[in-house]
Design a protein with these regions (language model features):
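Structured extracytoplasmic
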Residues: 15-202, 209-215, 220-256, 260-291
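Bacterial N-terminal signal peptides
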Residues: 1-12
Length: 291
């Protein structure tokens, strides 16, 4: 099942080539296994972390955050919003940075079926037509990314309680996780033309202690994906409340997402900003209800 997808351009400066015949990469140490010093070096944002003294509280914390994530998916309704994307690519064959700025409608729809965490996330242009991405490197799947903490999927990852850290004036709980590739169903995909590679992620969640909602979620590849030459990719999602007038519904949704990565000999940076969330009703004709 898809948790996110990254789409690489198949035109312009980034023409894909056949993957090199290389041996699979050696398994890398995950966030769950790193020492605090190793983690801080990898993720400098953790430098002010107040380290946990034990893991005794972890099962209860996972139960509480799992309940909050499950409630989000139980309460989720089809939504659309305005997405402003800034995409910047650097590479040795570019005389200057490739810079793209686009505005889209970002749509997240509930898919029929038993698994409520599977959402259909798509983009259209502001008039509802097909989204034109050009040479942008784009990622999709941010709304459902917290599914790694859903009770039905927690057994597919390893977790570790790191401690407390202040984020946006809140003394948050910080938990790291790493997917177990042998059992994980929530996988990411990297798409380059007709090549699709499956990837597994590790991540860090900053959790509000009063509500156990995830305020910030960062994910990284567990290891490089050599089939499509993706060396690294880091996604950082910041969430906030969105209240809709219809039914007085409140959802916990992405407000800002940054994606950094290295593909082939190129580095890329994307900034996604979300605004004007609306409920999206799919009927004989499509209608939008504004908050």
């Amino acid at each position: 099942m898809l948790s996110f997808a990254t789409l690489m351009p198949a035109m312009g400066f980034c023409q894909p080539s056949a993957p090199a015949a290389t041996a699979p990469p050696e398994p890398q140490q995950t966030y769950v296994d790193m020492t605090p010093a190793e983690l801080t070096k990898r993720v400098p944002d953790l430098k002010h972390l107040e380290l946990a003294q034990s893991q005794e509280i972890l099962p209860l914390m996972l139960q509480r955050v799992g309940a909050a994530v499950a409630a989000f998916f139980d309460n989720f309704s089809n939504t659309t919003c305005t997405e402003d994307v800034l995409s910047i690519v650097h590479g040795p064959h570019l005389t200057h940075e490739a810079r793209y700025e686009r505005r889209f409608n970002y749509i997240a729809l509930v898919k029929p079926g038993a698994d409520k965490t599977v959402l259909e996330e798509t983009r259209s242009d502001p008039k509802g037509g097909a989204a034109t991405l050009g040479g942008m490197i784009t990622t999709i799947g941010f709304v459902a990314l917290a599914a790694h903490f859903d009770p039905d999927y927690q057994r597919e990852s390893r977790f570790r309680y790191l401690g407390r850290e202040t984020f946006k004036d809140r003394n948050t709980y910080v938990i790291v996780f790493a997917q177990r590739p042998e059992v994980a169903r929530q996988t990411g995909h990297i798409v380059v033309r007709d090549r699709v590679a499956k990837v597994f992620v590790q991540g860090i969640a900053w959790i509000e202690p009063e509500t156990f909602r995830i305020l910030r979620l960062r994910t990284d590849l567990e290891q490089p994906e050599l089939q499509v030459d993706l060396k690294r990719e880091s996604t950082d999602v910041r969430y906030s409340d969105v209240t809709f007038a219809q039914g007085n519904k409140t959802l916990w949704l992405p407000r800002e997402v940054t994606v950094n990565g290295e593909w082939k000999q190129y580095t890329f940076y994307n900034l996604h900003r979300y605004s004007d969330y609306r409920l999206f009703l799919v009927q004989t004709e499509e209608k939008e209800k504004h908050p």
